[in-house]
Amino acid sequence: MILQRLFRFSSVIRSAVSVHLRRNIGVTAVAFNKELDPIQKLFVDKIREYKSKRQTSGGPVDASSEYQQELERELFKLKQMFGNADMNTFPTFKFEDPKFEVIEKPQA
């Protein structure tokens, strides 16, 4: 009888504690999201700016025409070297078993 009451009481406490912890975790997430340092804020702003530039350009950010031409040349070389294969997949290899010649040993 006492054990049953104890188990009921412990389950009530456990549920109350879990609700309390969930609320505290939500509050601490907001507190940790705050940018305290001005240098950190500048750094995060630059990263966001770079990300938006990269998404709009669809490639490298602030790349000169020489860089783009060099990139195209290197990709062309790779496509020629690997037979116009898809560069994003791992190549498949086909190995054949070597064929050995059977040599008869002379009987001594």
From Swiss-Prot:
<dbReference type="GO" id="GO:0005743">
    <property type="term" value="C:mitochondrial inner membrane"/>
</dbReference>
<feature type="modified residue" description="N6-acetyllysine">
    <location>
        <position position="41"/>
    </location>
</feature>
<keyword id="KW-0496">Mitochondrion</keyword>
<feature type="transit peptide" description="Mitochondrion">
    <location>
        <begin position="1"/>
        <end position="32"/>
    </location>
</feature>
<keyword id="KW-0375">Hydrogen ion transport</keyword>
<feature type="modified residue" description="N6-acetyllysine">
    <location>
        <position position="46"/>
    </location>
</feature>
<feature type="modified residue" description="N6-acetyllysine">
    <location>
        <position position="79"/>
    </location>
</feature>
<keyword id="KW-0813">Transport</keyword>
<feature type="modified residue" description="N6-succinyllysine; alternate">
    <location>
        <position position="94"/>
    </location>
</feature>
<keyword id="KW-0597">Phosphoprotein</keyword>
<comment type="subunit">
    <text>Component of the ATP synthase complex composed at least of ATP5F1A/subunit alpha, ATP5F1B/subunit beta, ATP5MC1/subunit c (homooctomer), MT-ATP6/subunit a, MT-ATP8/subunit 8, ATP5ME/subunit e, ATP5MF/subunit f, ATP5MG/subunit g, ATP5MK/subunit k, ATP5MJ/subunit j, ATP5F1C/subunit gamma, ATP5F1D/subunit delta, ATP5F1E/subunit epsilon, ATP5PF/subunit F6, ATP5PB/subunit b, ATP5PD/subunit d, ATP5PO/subunit OSCP.</text>
</comment>
<keyword id="KW-0138">CF(0)</keyword>
<dbReference type="GO" id="GO:0005739">
    <property type="term" value="C:mitochondrion"/>
</dbReference>
<dbReference type="GO" id="GO:0042776">
    <property type="term" value="P:proton motive force-driven mitochondrial ATP synthesis"/>
</dbReference>
<feature type="modified residue" description="Phosphoserine">
    <location>
        <position position="65"/>
    </location>
</feature>
<dbReference type="GO" id="GO:0021762">
    <property type="term" value="P:substantia nigra development"/>
</dbReference>
<feature type="modified residue" description="N6-acetyllysine; alternate">
    <location>
        <position position="99"/>
    </location>
</feature>
<dbReference type="GO" id="GO:0045259">
    <property type="term" value="C:proton-transporting ATP synthase complex"/>
</dbReference>
<keyword id="KW-0007">Acetylation</keyword>
<keyword id="KW-0472">Membrane</keyword>
<comment type="similarity">
    <text>Belongs to the eukaryotic ATPase subunit F6 family.</text>
</comment>
<dbReference type="InterPro" id="IPR008387">
    <property type="entry name" value="ATP_synth_f6_mt"/>
</dbReference>
<keyword id="KW-0809">Transit peptide</keyword>
<protein>
    <recommendedName>
        <fullName>ATP synthase peripheral stalk subunit F6, mitochondrial</fullName>
    </recommendedName>
</protein>
<feature type="modified residue" description="N6-succinyllysine; alternate">
    <location>
        <position position="99"/>
    </location>
</feature>
<comment type="function">
    <text>Subunit F6, of the mitochondrial membrane ATP synthase complex (F(1)F(0) ATP synthase or Complex V) that produces ATP from ADP in the presence of a proton gradient across the membrane which is generated by electron transport complexes of the respiratory chain. ATP synthase complex consist of a soluble F(1) head domain - the catalytic core - and a membrane F(1) domain - the membrane proton channel. These two domains are linked by a central stalk rotating inside the F(1) region and a stationary peripheral stalk.</text>
</comment>
<dbReference type="Pfam" id="PF05511">
    <property type="entry name" value="ATP-synt_F6"/>
</dbReference>
<feature type="modified residue" description="N6-acetyllysine">
    <location>
        <position position="105"/>
    </location>
</feature>
<dbReference type="InterPro" id="IPR036204">
    <property type="entry name" value="ATP_synth_f6_sf_mt"/>
</dbReference>
<keyword id="KW-0999">Mitochondrion inner membrane</keyword>
<dbReference type="GO" id="GO:0015986">
    <property type="term" value="P:proton motive force-driven ATP synthesis"/>
</dbReference>
<feature type="modified residue" description="N6-acetyllysine; alternate">
    <location>
        <position position="94"/>
    </location>
</feature>
<keyword id="KW-0406">Ion transport</keyword>
<dbReference type="GO" id="GO:0015078">
    <property type="term" value="F:proton transmembrane transporter activity"/>
</dbReference>
